Design a protein with these regions (language model features):
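Structural signal for interior beta-strand "rungs" in well-ordered beta-sheet cores
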Residues: 38, 96-307
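Terminal amphipathic alpha-helical/low-complexity segments used for targeting or macromolecular assembly
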Residues: 1-100, 161, 166, 172-173, ...
Length: 346
């Protein structure tokens, strides 16, 4: 693709050789004459100028003293992501049902759907047009998949769950397993039936081996545009808002509410019925206690989660703890000497 065409497609401007062909995206370290590179910040500018990439996508203020071929974009990361998708389109699956797949007679299969080997689709399921279902997937009864979804190999969607249009579910994820609910009867636990479901909005992406449990009653909800990384656990009756991002190995206990546009780091633990406000940021490894409220726009870290400034102050004090212990021991020694001297004078 020519640089001129790519810039026009991105709605950006270019400088340099507009007729230069770029055929793939590459890192700055490995890029060659026909590769497209990316400079996202001023810090990377020097590396970008030294790169052998045939073309660079850069921010508007990028210096270009060597008159390199560049594409200036107001949002360079977004522009580069779109360019990567254009230069490296996903392989199209041939529509149709593999001979080893099992599809219930009452299932509704949209046009252009591809169902891979050894997959199953249950009674009353509805599969939207142009959806791709990989090998070994299990789609339960009355499941609804929107248009243009992609289910990679070995995804399981339990009965009665809904997944919106253009959803991406990576290998091994499980949607709609029973929530962790039990009642103590005498000296033993009895299972609390989990009769709710899971509903996932449009344009969501669910990482590999992530599990989203069905509600005990009602709905476990994932809002549109939300992205969950690998190995995330969402407990029963959680309500995750729109355009929330969650990094790997994070766990949501039952009944947690996360409002729109929150950012949650990796290995975060969130207790029952906690509430995370819109645009809040939870740092990696922090712990939010049961029923705790993290207010809108707040940045928290540590366990128990607390405002970042407070956490950093406490961390700085903690690092000085060995020194402070020595100082305290010295103060005690000197105090004892003074007290001993006073007693002798008496």
């Amino acid at each position: 693709m020519r640089v001129r065409e790519l810039a026009e497609w991105l709605g950006a401007t270019f400088e340099g050789d507009g007729e230069r062909e770029v055929v793939r995206a590459a890192s700055l370290e490995s890029a060659g004459a026909t590769d497209l590179g990316f400079v996202g910040s001023r810090k990377a500018a020097e590396q970008g100028l030294a790169s052998a990439a045939g073309c660079l996508i850069v921010p508007p203020e990028f210096p270009n003293p060597a008159a390199r071929t560049i594409i200036r974009a107001c949002e360079p990361r977004t522009a580069f992501a779109r360019a990567v998708g254009r230069l490296h389109p996903a392989a199209a699956a041939e529509p149709g049902v593999h001979p080893t797949a099992v599809v219930a007679e009452s299932a509704e299969i949209g046009s252009g759907v591809a169902i891979g080997p050894h997959s199953s689709v249950g009674e009353g399921a509805r599969i939207g047009a142009r959806t791709r279902i990989g090998a070994g997937c299990a789609i339960g009864r009355r499941v609804r998949l929107g248009e243009e979804c992609t289910l990679h190999a070995n995804v399981t969607v339990y009965d009665d769950c809904d997944i919106g249009a253009r959803g991406i579910l990576h290998s091994g994820c499980v949607i709609g397993a029973d929530g962790f609910g039990f009642a103590m009867a005498g000296d033993r636990y009895e299972k609390f039936p989990q009769i709710g479901r899971v509903a996932i909005g449009d344009d969501c992406e669910i990482g590999a081996n992530t599990c989203i449990d069905r509600a005990a009653l009602g709905v476990t909800w994932i809002g549109e545009g939300t992205k969950l990384d690998n190995l995330v656990q969402v407990g029963h009756n959680c309500r995750i808002g729109r355009h929330v991002v969650v990094a790997a190995q994070t766990g949501f206990s039952g009944g947690v509410v996360v409002e729109d546009y929150a950012v949650i780091g990796g290995q975060v633990g969130i207790g029952d019925k906690a509430r995370i406000g819109t645009h809040a940021v939870l740092g990696s490894g922090c712990g939010v206690l049961t029923s705790k409220i993290v207010h809108a726009g707040q940045v928290v870290w540590g366990t128990p989660a607390r405002p970042l400034k407070e956490y950093l102050e406490q961390l700085a004090s903690l690092r000085r703890l060995p020194e402070m212990r020595q100082e305290l021991a010295e103060f005690r020694r000197r105090l004892e000497e003074l007290e001993s001297a006073d007693r002798r004078r008496e």
